[in-house]
A protein has these predicted regions:
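N-terminal adaptor-interaction module of cullin-RING ubiquitin ligase components
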Residues: 2-191, 195-240, 244-245, 260, ...
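C-terminal capping region of solenoid repeat domains
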Residues: 2-37, 48-49, 131-167, 171, ...
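Catalytic cores of nucleophile-dependent amide-cleaving enzymes
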Residues: 271
């Protein structure tokens, strides 16, 4: 028989050498048989056993029944508290999620299709921006919507050009999205130099209706023509200052012509920072016969593009946002034409200092029934007087027009016999005491009036119906309820009986 090992653990009267015991002192939770256990081990052994967790009552419910119950929850609870109950609830809540904004590109190619298999609205642009590695973690963030950019306080300017992921990484992610989400309806992504990713989206997502494409160039718009059912398109052109592209990047007449010939079912088109001229807008108007809403923001177009709006035969809404100029050279008025179907003209945060450009805009939109001017610069009396060229206006909204006076406003709106609604907000030079009897009569015939040109008018409007400004005894007169009257009567009867 083999000899017993004298150095084994647990033998009575047998032990380890002194140096071996010293080596085990670094393990406080390990003791030898025959030795005294540590105080921590004794307390753990003497502690009462924890009660078993209560049974999960939802295990008796099928996935289909639980999905119907979770579908009744509003979106914040569905994505928040319900997903934290257990793994099963997290998986089922992910199946009900329809919209998601991704911030980590690694999640796109790995866990996204398993965590949220039925997405219809996917925002990939925030995840396509590469995080800077050289900046410390305490650097401030600049957040705009779903996008957060890291600032470098030591640099001038602190916000440099955005650094995006490599084009092959973007293409692989878009290919994975196309293979996993065939029912995708809306997508926001970053255009790559190669067109493989967007072509995969066009082939794998046949029901895609809305596309938002950032860092666009003329070449990046080639695969957009493959989207057969695209109805809403938002293009953010590549800007050298923000995206770090070359001076020849961006969207010109070439890119506008490409998308016009490919996306003939467009209903809404938004162009941000795009170049181009008469030819590009004319191509969009000729080919996109269903176009109803056109938004042009911060454009860099050449002179003469306003005349091309006459080719948009079904256009109903024209919106200009953040434009430093309208049209430098609109050409003769007889060559401008007009949008006969236009219903709404909206100007937001635009420079309205060019008399020729603004006059050409109102001539093209002379049939507009709704005019909105919000926080625009340079809208003085002589500039706003050009709005009188539009004779069919039914709704006028002015907000933040601090240079406009009451007399000019009256001279324009009295020309509009069809005016039904008027909104004047934060126009400091429009005064209540300057309202003439004719203007008061016009106000009385309106169906809707929102009059808050300054703080004083805002206060006066807010006091209507509150009986504020009356004497204190009238305003603070207590309203006695029937129950109070009964209690008061009982108290009077009781006091009368006691006195008797």
């Amino acid at each position: 028989m083999p000899e017993p090992d004298l150095h084994c653990l647990g033998g009575r009267g047998l032990g380890l050498h002194h140096h071996q015991r010293q080596q085990l002192k670094g393990w406080p939770d390990l003791w030898l048989v025959g030795d005294k256990p540590s105080p921590r081990a004794r307390s753990a052994a003497m502690a009462p056993a924890s009660p078993p967790p209560p049974p999960n009552q939802t295990l008796a419910l099928s996935d289909g029944l639980l999905l119907r119950a979770l579908a009744c929850l509003p979106e914040p609870h569905l994505t928040g508290a319900a997903s934290l109950v257990c793994r099963r609830w997290m998986r089922l809540a992910g199946r009900l999620r329809r919209r998601l904004a991704v911030r980590d590109w690694a999640f796109v190619t790995h866990r996204l299709p398993y965590r949220f298999p039925d997405l219809a609205d996917l925002e990939l642009f925030p995840a396509s921006i590469a995080a800077p590695t050289a900046l410390p973690h305490t650097s401030p963030l600049l957040t705009c919507g779903e996008v957060s950019l890291t600032l470098d306080p030591s640099a001038d300017p602190p916000l440099g050009a955005c650094r995006f992921l490599d084009d092959d990484v973007l293409d692989r992610g878009l290919t994975a999205v196309a293979a996993s989400f065939p029912n995708l309806r809306r997508l926001s992504a970053t255009a790559a130099a190669e067109s493989g990713g967007l072509m995969a989206i066009a082939c794998g997502c046949p029901t895609l209706q809305e596309l938002e494409l950032h860092r666009c160039t003329d070449l990046a718009l080639r695969p957009v023509s493959a989207f057969a059912h695209l109805q809403i398109l938002r293009i953010v052109a590549a800007s050298p200052a923000l995206y770090g592209t070359g001076e020849d990047g961006g969207v010109t007449d070439i890119g506008l012509t490409i998308l016009a010939h490919g996306c003939k079912r467009l209903v809404k088109l938004e162009l941000l920072g795009c170049e181009g001229s008469y030819d590009g807008i004319a191509a969009v108007g000729r080919c996109c016969a269903m176009l109803e809403e056109l938004t042009i923001a911060d454009h860099r177009m050449d002179g003469g593009w306003l005349a091309a709006l006459a080719f948009c035969g079904n256009l109903k809404t024209l919106r200009l946002q953040g434009c430093s100029r309208i049209d430098d050279d609109p050409g003769p008025a007889e060559h401008l034409g007009a949008c006969l179907t236009l219903e709404s003209l909206q100007l937001k945060r635009c420079q309205l200092r060019d008399h020729r450009g603004l006059r050409a805009l109102f001539l093209v939109c002379e049939g507009a029934r709704e005019i909105q001017v919000q926080n625009c610069w340079g809208l003085e009396d002589d500039m706003f007087a050009l709005a009188g060229l539009c004779r069919r206006v039914k709704f006028l909204s002015l907000e933040g027009c601090s240079l406009l006076t009451t007399r000019c406003l009256e001279s324009v709106i009295t020309l509009w016999s069809d005016l039904q609604s008027l909104e004047v907000v934060s126009c400091s030079k429009i005064k209540d005491e300057e309202i003439s009897p004719a203007l008061s009569e016009l106000f009385s015939n309106l169906k809707e009036l929102k009059w808050r040109p300054d703080n004083k008018s805002l206060l006066a409007a807010s006091l209507v119906g509150t009986r504020m400004g009356k004497k204190g005894r009238v305003f603070f007169k207590r309203k006695i309820l029937p129950a109070h009257q009964r209690i008061k009567g009982k108290m009077l009867n009781h006091s009368t009986g006691a006195a008797a």
